Amino acid sequence: MINNEPFPSADSASILTTSTSNNSLMSYNHQPQLSINSVQSLLEPVTPPPLGQMNNKRNHQKAHSLDLSGFNQFISSTQSPLALMNNTSTSNSANSFSPNPNAASNSTGLSASMANPPAILPLINEFDLEMDGPRRKSSHDFTVVAPSNSGVNTSSLIMETPSSSVTPAASLRNFSNSNNAASKCGVDNSSFGLSSSTSSSMVEISALPLRDLDYIKLATDQFGCRFLQKKLETPSESNMVRDLMYEQIKPFFLDLILDPFGNYLVQKLCDYLTAEQKTLLIQTIYPNVFQISINQYGTRSLQKIIDTVDNEVQIDLIIKGFSQEFTSIEQVVTLINDLNGNHVIQKCIFKFSPSKFGFIIDAIVEQNNIITISTHKHGCCVLQKLLSVCTLQQIFKISVKIVQFLPGLINDQFGNYIIQFLLDIKELDFYLLAELFNRLSNELCQLSCLKFSSNVVEKFIKKLFRIITGFIVNNNGGASQRTAVASDDVINASMNILLTTIDIFTVNLNVLIRDNFGNYALQTLLDVKNYSPLLAYNKNSNAIGQNSSSTLNYGNFCNDFSLKIGNLIVLTKELLPSIKTTSYAKKIKLKVKAYAEATGIPFTDISPQVTAMSHNNLQTINNENKNPHNKNSHNHNHNHNHNHAHNNNNNNNQKSHTRHFSLPANAYHRRSNSSVTNNFSNQYAQDQKIHSPQQIMNFNQNAYPSMGAPSFNSQTNPPLVSHNSLQNFDNRQFANLMAHPNSAAPIHSFSSSNITNVNPNVSRGFKQPGFMMNETDKINANHFSPYSNANSQNFNESFVPRMQYQTEGANWDSSLSMKSQHIGQGPYNQVNMSRNASISNMPAMNTARTSDELQFTLP
């Protein structure tokens, strides 16, 4: 093998002797290789063997391009580096012109020089030798030399000084092209002196008169664009350059706006143009605002133009470009959702007055464009910015369209933010609260169990609390502390909706507390921080304050609210063991404890204790709820066994372990046994023949004045989930406890059979087993919901019985007289709401189930 390394050669004997001694020395000094993870390698770093010695390994082919073994000659050589280089060139020239027949001596010639170690290492600049002789240097000759092994064509990187026939702009463009070509080939321009060439070219262009410059070519060049921007920034030349540039680029202004480099010059020029010049330029481009806005370069220029407009004439020209004469409604919607165009629309929103927003609002309210815009990432942001600055009339116009398409927005990943944004606008409370509740009440439970709509439900509940508590704090403060609050109609609607929402959450507690998203809405309703002023206890002065308005009976509302929220807290506490394996069980428990601390009731007393009832009393209650087909005979036996077990618990200790089924709602085992669902549906069909539907809740007109809104009909729109069978409750002991919160709680005062606000003379006309989530695969056959998605659970009407009440022979208390009230208008069939007909027949919790019920729950 012929070695062409640039090192001096020696005679054969010297080569053999030196090579042998050097190899023995290297083998003796070589340290064994250690693993990089070994302890010794960390304590004593190991020097790897020379690359030349590694070539002796078997089955290893030497890579000539990586052969650095000859570099060791610099360490052992006594000659100067320049002498080595001279010898190398002599040796290489001899080898290149006369082949050496003795390859062995030539291959060992590298190690011969190691006998003469150099005194010093070579400096970097000592290698910068002119191989081809001295080079002529001239101020008009700029030649770039590329390395021979770089693979770059040297001729493509040569740039000479332009002759008199070439314009300066063309010279700059040629340099720019050569510079780009060099960068594409992986060549570093700085290593070849390109910066000097650029400086020289720019100096020559700067020396030319301003009238002789080609502004069009300079504006579309990377360096020429920077050159002109600097000229504009120079105070002495700014006005002259502006006028000359304006005259040349006026016919090509649209092209410059869309140019990758020209758009920067346009943005800079906007700061220096006069009002007349800017108006003329806007006149040339306003018919093309759509094309400019969607362009990645044009959007920057147009935003700068909008940001620097000086008068109404310029604004009107831009608005005219967005009118339907030049830009259609579909194109405006495209701009709102476009990556580049949405910034132009936002610039118009923040720069122009609301009277100029007509083209945006017209596009939003056209047909179903509100869905297209609100459910888009960029459109959602534009719509929120628009709602934050436009007038109340414009907000109302948009909000009506949003409410119209509410089902398509509330559970969308972007659309739900629009609804939440509307809830923050106080001026819309007079109609928005009632409209939202009218459209969402029948689906409130299911919406609470969906990922995005659950955020809207939480926001809605917090809104109700904020309106009512704000009224209370303002009403009980002094005259100097009172501020503007919502009107009486808004407060009335908020009170009615809040009480109804608590009832809906109570009957659907089994579903909400086990759902991965529904538990968040439940926690919001349970959080005592939201309603601490509403608790009707003597120690809470705000709850017993005098009302400033005679039309509002706040005392009655506080009593009703305290009873309902107390009932919900008790039932939630009762269900805590069933969710102990979930991640949010501790948070819900803390909410219950916070309620106990706020009301002064020990946490342990909140736990329900089912009272011992005699067999005769239980027989009487069951007979009231019994139908002619004896469908409740099983419930009678179950309740009898249940009370018998609790009678024994009074004397004996309860079993140390009770099995609870605590799987989240989304993880429940789905059964394929259709007989279970069919039997349950048949039983419900018998109920339908016997019991006529009654009002769920009716708001007392004396306590809450009518708002003139239609009522809801539960028969037409059944609730989403089963209204669990509840025991008959009596509120007398709980009301007595509220009157004396500091006294000792009587035994069984917090029984789940004593909390709910229901008149004991009223009997409920239905009995049914609890809702079983493991049958959700059978309840989705015939029911369609506009809020359904992959994460939702639809509930079949045949499986979910409607809430019905039987009021045969019932005499409602005169203080709680029922009169149908209304909560707002809506397209759905309404459900009559009653503020005092609270939830009954809740199934007993934590009790042993019969074999018939276990077939629903056991996996």
UniProtKB/Swiss-Prot annotation:
One of its GO terms (biological process) is negative regulation of translation. InterPro entries: ARM-like (IPR011989), ARM-type_fold (IPR016024), PUM-HD (IPR033133), Pumilio_RNA-bd (IPR033712), Pumilio_RNA-bd_rpt (IPR001313). Disulfide bonds: none annotated. It is found in: Cytoplasm. The keyword Phosphoprotein applies. Keywords: Cytoplasm, Phosphoprotein, Repeat, RNA-binding. Residues 628-645 have a biased composition (Basic residues). Present with 1240 molecules/cell in log phase SD medium. PANTHER family: RNA BINDING PROTEIN PUMILIO-RELATED, SUPPRESSOR PROTEIN MPT5. This is Suppressor protein MPT5.
